[in-house]
Amino acid sequence: MNNALTKYEVNNQMVWRGNLSKIDGSPLEKPVHFYIRPLSVENASQMGELSEAIYNNLKEGEECFIHKHSKEYYYDVFQNDNIHYIGVFVGSKLVGMSYLKVCHNEEELQEELPNSSYNFFKNSKREVKVASFGADSVLPSYRGNSLNAMMINYRMSLASRLDCTDCTSIVDRNNRWNMTPYFANRFNLFSTAIDPSDGGKISLLHKPMSKDTVLSNIKTRITLPYNRFELIDDLIKKGFIGVEFDKKDANVTFAHSNFYVSNIRRLPRVFDTRFNKNAFVI
């Protein structure tokens, strides 16, 4: 992780400054600052160039990780007041970016969190505003500096300033590199789906702003490889959610929660020692 961030405001907008630890995988002898701040239509051309550069550096099979957009797309996107783009700069160079979209109803959220079976707006006793996070994009030469995690953390702070009640995001199920920063920021893997835009398999992630945990009193923990999709889907149907990710072993740890189901599901009383002595049969 990088050195401590310096956080300040310019024209009522958050600006975070930190130090890079490496560029192109090589440690830096002298400090090099980066800045995270909001983007504007003036950055649209840089955003299009960054999107193209990142997409062109994807390996085979990673095409579903992000969507490539032109600078014309980014000029148009700033017409929507509910979308807030942020960027990571090294000097005047844009090296990373993402966005937050404030959703006020289920229809708006479905555009960002497709095929989610959980309705965040149904039967709520308070006004619900969901901050849906877009993909985190960083130039390959600047990876390894935890910039993804800091962009997530920045947007969580922005969501709080915008009075959002929840944060959500999607991650391609094969993109284990983006799982680490979301789980580090206490997001829950609560469902899986198919992205209608490209047919990719996605994990749906959520963090309630007002709760530290949504776990039930059932203490069972089950660990599975991130790519055992059928087993993971079966666990989710039984009321389990992903709560931790082991980057080294690429394993997801699941725990039980009643938060994402309309009623409590009855769990089988048979035990299985394939995963641990207290694991429910899957």
Task: Pin down the residues of each PLM region.
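A short beta-loop-alpha structural element at the N-terminal edge
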Residues: 32-50, 60, 224-225
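Active-site rim helix/loop that mediates acceptor-substrate recognition in acyltransferases
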Residues: 51-107, 231, 246-251
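Conserved acyl-donor/pantetheine-binding loop and adjacent beta-alpha core of acyl/acetyltransferases
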Residues: 95-135
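Conserved acyl-CoA
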Residues: 122-127, 150-166
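Conserved GNAT acetyl-CoA-binding A-motif
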Residues: 130-131, 159-172, 200
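Conserved acetyl-CoA-binding loop-helix of GNAT-fold acetyltransferases
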Residues: 135-138, 143-159
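Conserved beta-strand-loop-alpha-helix junction that forms the acyl-donor binding cleft
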Residues: 155, 168-179, 197, 224-226
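Conserved active-site alpha-helix within GNAT-family acetyltransferase domains
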Residues: 160-163, 173-192
